[in-house]
Structures are given as structure tokens and as C-alpha cells.
Amino acid sequence: RSDLKDLGYIEAFTALEHSESGKRARLMTMHPGGGSAYATSYAPQKIIEAFQPGEKPAVAIFGHYHKMEYVQIRGVHAIQAGCTKDLDPFGRKKRLSYHVGGAIIELRQLPDGTIQDCICWFRQYHDRSYVNDQCSNSHRPTRKKSR
């Protein structure tokens, strides 16, 4: 598809350049690994805390955890992007919650390159018809096969 750009494997840094001054900030997109934590912000927080001085991005967008969230961590606008996969038996067994949906993000950048504002409009989708159909199948009587 011509409207998509492959940013690479696991993580990518994109320059956000101010249209008049040319000053830049960095946006990081990342698909990290690991399991889901009890606190929604824990995994992004630990990733951002692990950056060396001078390498933190201004904005970080995370996938993988099936969560939607905006939080500021150590001066970084951290966003969890949500997912397009609804909860399945595996997720239910692991006691996970999936946030199905995504976000529209608006950034306002100062002439010195600093990201002053980060506005996120989250859109969450709740389609329980599939899950309800699956659950209703389990309440039907079981019939023994004749021999």
C-alpha cells in the first residue's frame, strides 16, 4: 500500500521538524515485548526510565500491550496505541484486558522544537456480539454421541 511506511523492526525514531524554525524533536514508535503488568503504565514507564541521558524521545507510542493510555513520564508524552484484537480465551485465561480502538494525536511544537501540547482523542470500540455468541454456545446442553 502506498499510504503506509514500514518504519522497521521493534522500534523507530522519527524527526518532528518545526515548519518555520527547522528545530526538531524525536518521536519513537515501539513494539516491545514482555507480558502485561498489573498497572497499565508500568511497562512504558520502565522503558522510558531505562533511556540514557540525552536519548529520551519527546513522544513515545507503544504497541504490544493491548492498552490505550496517555501519560507523561519523565517529560516524555507516552501513548499506548490500543489494539484491533478483542479479548479471546487466551487473554481471559491470563486475566488480561484489551483496549480495542486507537487514537488521533495532535502535537503542538514550539519554535525551539519542544513539544508543548499533546492532545489524544481515544476511540474505543465495544463489540460484544462475537464474545456473547461464543459464551452462549457453552450453555447449550451436551449430547452424548450414540455408539
Name these PLM-found stretches.
Residues G8-I10, H99:
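Residues that act as N-cap/strand-start positions at coil-to-secondary-structure junctions
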Residues R24-M28, G33-C118:
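Conserved beta-sheet core of the metallophosphoesterase superfamily
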Residues Q109-R147:
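A short C-terminal boundary segment appended to hydrolase-like catalytic domains
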Residues I10-G22, V71-I73:
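Short acidic-hydrophobic surface loop/beta-edge motif
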Residues R1-D6:
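Active-site neighborhood of divalent metal-dependent phosphoester bond hydrolases
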